[in-house]
Each structure stands twice: as structure tokens, then as C-alpha cells.
């Protein structure tokens, strides 16, 4: 098997994983238009090639929330990570730690906070959802703080689960889902042995520790469905500040006014994100949303971005559009499913090499030199031509 890009890991993961797991991470909401646009829009961002610039002292190092990162990349929070490789969160965290970048543990991880945090040298980040059960939220915040987590990533674009039609077809949900998942596991012996048998327990560690009992996949679906809170508002975030005094990042921002609200609230960062196209189909891609948000709050708050990033070139594009750092999600999960820690480590090496090539050929010696000037622009407009709003003729 030849691996030269994240797309190769995706193909390998599809062969390795039972369909219900592959399509759970690979799919999006509704007809998946936003899922596709995340990738397509970003791929159309054109960079300015510059030559004869003496790029011998190129550096990818950057600083975020008083942490030094070897490159402006962090691993995004991904639920059920431990179902994609044996104790998957531990393996992914180890790869990120070795690379010198942050790993973000999801609320709905298989491995609990207390299992992952002691295995790495640098502080990990912790992601928390807006949930009705405030007791759980407080418990999770206290445990994250006790484990030395440095940054809280608070996901706000999930007051209700998205409509993910692919899950019903794949066996993650829908009629006879448990039986369908069982037979899929039987037909994928590599996964069944490595994860199905030797990756136990398969409960959601952070939730189990709070409830005092194991939580399987059906429990996970039911517990989340009953606990997402559509009543959340900015006032609720003030409550969280009572229990968390470290950096707080608001994840799920697509509108400049919401970004300004995050600044007014006193958040330390935002993630420009549409949840990887998994929540509301038809919203802007992150690449389209990012420039206007950067115009509104750049310099007032740290800007992170995710959704659609598949390689190092995409990282450079996102930074040129206005991000300070990006989050990788699906790309690293494909690598994790294929080859565990080694797969994630190799993917991060590929991203680093791709970034160096892009920066060398655009004349940017450092991350701070990647800016809107790195983009090919249309008649002096601040928004790249490929991402400019469609005209009526284009829409037809």
C-alpha cells in the first residue's frame, strides 16, 4: 500500500473499517452539499507563486495560548475515536505530542480524560458540548482541569443533532442497526480483532465515569439525543467561566456577528467551522466564511478554522484566508484507522512537508508572512476570486 496523501488513508480506511464506522466519519448532513463544498471551495483558493526569495531559513513554528506549536495545526475533537483504532485517543494523542502540536479530546471519546492525559508530555485540550445535564458539564470541566488540560474547546453549533441520512443506510442508526453492525464487524476481521476484541471497553469513558456505569453505542446515541440543549445562549457561557479559568475557544462560528459576540464575551479564540458539514447542510463552507470573520475580529481574538482541510497546502490556504491555526479532523482519523499512531504521525509529517513546499513557493519564510497578500485576488478585492459571492448568472 502506497501512502502519499490523506486521500490514500481515506481509501485504506474504507477497506479496513466496518461501513457504519467509515460512513459515520466520512458522511455529512442531509444531501452533503456543505461537506463537498468545504473541500471544493478550499481547493479553488489560488496562491501567488513567488521565486528567488532565499527560503533557506523557513520555519513553521507558531505560538497559540502561550503554547509553542511546531506548526499551526491541532488535532480536532472527534467522537468515538477509540472505535477507529485500539484505544484510538491514546494513539492519536501520542502522535500529536511527538509532533509538538495539541490533541483535543472529545466529550464523547472512548478513552476517558484520565486515561489519555498521563500518556503525553504536553497539555491536551478538552472539548465540551452544550448539554442539559449541567452536572455532567461541571464534572467534565473539573476532571479536565485536574488532568492538566490547558484549553477548553466549547462546541456551540450542536444544540440539536444534524440529520445525517448516511448513518441510517450504513447501520449506525436505523432499523436493525445493532445486527447490521455485528455482521459488518464479522466481515472486517482486521478491525474486529484489533478494535472489536482487543480495544475494549467500548463505552464512552468520560460519560461512564460520571454515570457510574458503562455506556455502549446505543446508550451514546440515546444519551446525546436527550441531552443536547437548544436553550443555550451567551449567558450560559458565563456559567462555564465559573469553572474554567484557562483559555476558552468557541467552536462553530460562521458569522462575523457571532465572532464579534465571542470577543465581547471574552473568549480567547474561535473556530470557524460548520462541524465538517455534519450539522446544517447548505451553510457556507469554512473557506467562504473565514475572510469576513477575519476582517471583523482579526487581532482581537485567536482564529482557528476547520472543515475541508486535507493536506498542508490547505493549511496554508486557510492561514492566508485569515486563520491563525487549523484543526485536522477526518484526515487524521483516516490515518488512525489505517495504521494507528504511526499512521497519524506519518500524516502529520506529510502535512509538514506540504506546508514547507507551499511556503517555499509563495515566498513565506514564517507563518506570520502568510497573509491575504499570498492569494491571487480579483481586481484588488480582498476576497479571492474563487470564493467571491456568486452572481445571478453563476447561480443559474
Swiss-Prot record:
Pfam family, one: FMN_dh
Catalytic residues identified in the record: 275 (proton acceptor)
EC code: 1.1.-.-
Reactions catalysed, as given in the entry: (S)-lactate + A = pyruvate + AH2
Domain of life per record: Bacteria
Residues binding FMN, per UniProt: 106, 127, 155, 251, 306-330
Major location (coarse): membrane
FMN hydroxy acid dehydrogenase domain segment(s): 1-380
Localization per record: Cell inner membrane
Disulfide-linked positions: none
Required cofactor(s): FMN
Residues the entry annotates as binding substrate: 24, 129, 164, 278
Molecular-function GO terms, alphabetical: FMN binding; L-lactate dehydrogenase activity
Xref: InterPro entries: Aldolase_TIM (IPR013785), Alpha-hydoxy_acid_DH_FMN (IPR012133), FMN-dep_DH (IPR000262), FMN_HAD (IPR037396), FMN_hydac_DH_AS (IPR008259), LldD (IPR020920)
Annotated keywords: Cell inner membrane, Cell membrane, Flavoprotein, FMN, Membrane, Oxidoreductase
Membrane topology: Peripheral membrane protein
Gene Ontology CC: plasma membrane
Gene Ontology biological process: aerobic respiration; lactate metabolic process
Matches recorded under PANTHER family: L-LACTATE DEHYDROGENASE, S -2-HYDROXY-ACID OXIDASE-RELATED
Its biological purpose: Catalyzes the conversion of L-lactate to pyruvate. Is coupled to the respiratory chain.
HAMAP family for the chain: L_lact_dehydr
Membership in a protein family: Belongs to the FMN-dependent alpha-hydroxy acid dehydrogenase family.
Protein name: L-lactate dehydrogenase
Gene name of the encoded protein: lldD
